[in-house]
């Protein structure tokens, strides 16, 4: 879950891949993966995955059905991201914040302004989702495409995340890795004009693995 990794994996039949292809992030490997100097890395994996997702939607011609799974990992430890306007906005909003200093045994790097980092990650993900929907509309796919937004588990406490501060689980008990409802209950939002009624909430139970 490092956001400035040494490599990303790709498997694309449309690109002729017959096996997983490892793509080395050449700019990132010029700097340490942990500790001092890590902040000099510039290739942010979440942005790269999102850009590839938009390009993939753009490549669809509408003549054949398509199915895409966009595996965004925001928000998640480690709590780091580009020093852009999204992060700066939240740095100026929190009167109560904290720094999380990485212990020597952790795979996660130190996170300064951890509350602001987490909030900015949520906004960054929201921006990604908005851009995906905008791209579908631009291509004319929004009238016959079903979009599902979901997650894999409840909130976590690693890397400086603070679910109690944000009230993530409200009245639900537990967090990630626990079998209480707070650990296993996740959002599930479906969007599909003409297919899914807007503004409707139901109590249908399902499992997403």
Please report, for each region that a protein language model flagged, where it lies by residue.
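Active-site-proximal cap/lid insertion segments
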Residues: 2-209
